[in-house]
Amino acid sequence: MKAEGIGWGKLFVAGEYAVVHPGHPAIILATNRCIRVTIETSNQFCLINTNNQKKIVFDDLNVRDEYWKFLIAALNVFYRLLQEKGCRFSSVSITVNSDLDSEDGRKLGLGSSGAIVAAIIKGLNRFYQLNLNSISMFKLCVISQSDLKVQGSYGDLAAAIYGGIIQYTRFEDVDMTGSISALLNTEWPQLSVSYLNYPFDLHWVVGWTGEPASTQRRVDWVHAFIENEKYIQLLDLSKKIVYEMIQSHDIESFLNGIRQYRDWLNQLEILTDLTIETSQIKSFIEICTQHHGSGKSSGAGGGDCAIAFFPHPVAINDILLSKGIMPLTIQIAKREVV
């Protein structure tokens, strides 16, 4: 028996930081750069990363290993579900292949942690033929990350599961203890994932700065301002900007939304004294603006990636490279409606 699972990478188009709060929308693009896993029957649990040849073999799921923690957590959650359902299960071998890293092994900031969890859950769903729908697989991903005390918007998990371009809003906090089956069958207040269909063509360029950034630490830093009156006003403004972008009927209004959200992030920087738009990201945006585009940091900022949209195709890769910015060839991942 063999099955494959794919977890798509992600790029935030708009809504970052605000989206960690329930009911605040984000627009997220799932990338065709992804993590693929192949799952096969085995006498022992075996995890293999073909990119760096790392490998671990173990007999039960109580194993602890920092490098493999996201995969092991996803396995644990899925096998608990199998147990609740009374399904027969066995140990498996999982081979991992990723194109979310650079050639020298550095992460590109495309959500590899979320992508690997989604790939495992999708692959196990096919392997054990549970026929779970997309929202149930998303919930399993969230539960597995919750077990690791990972906090955030979980928008990367939604993109990794669904593909396409999505509108996403985070759920209100849910008690993750108890029956997994019950959690899958319970409505999570304010959780929303839906595909966006724009009536105009999108052209974009993605630049990787080569500077790593820690999303968790940056989100935690901003969260300390939750009771600040100016921050609350910014959250309301974020919701307005993103909803207007979601409803865009032409490319110009969409590009204006990108500019507005860049300004929003700049205001957040001033309020929190956190560097989101680094000098390289600023350089990327300036180059794109000169070619009639609208750009911004994507995700937590402070490094990683920036994204810009244009009313027409552009050829600026050589210019970006001359500034030390690596252009990434990225298409939108296919939709996975289940």
Predicted regions and their residues:
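C-terminal nucleotide
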Residues: 2-14, 18-21, 28-88, 101-105, ...
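Glycine-rich active-site/cofactor-binding loop and its immediate structural neighborhood
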Residues: 303-305
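DPxDG-like acidic metal-binding loop motif
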Residues: 109-131
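Short loop/turn motifs enriched for small/polar and acidic residues
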Residues: 97-99
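Alpha-helical scaffolds flanking conserved acidic
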Residues: 135-137
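Conserved phosphate-donor
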Residues: 93-95
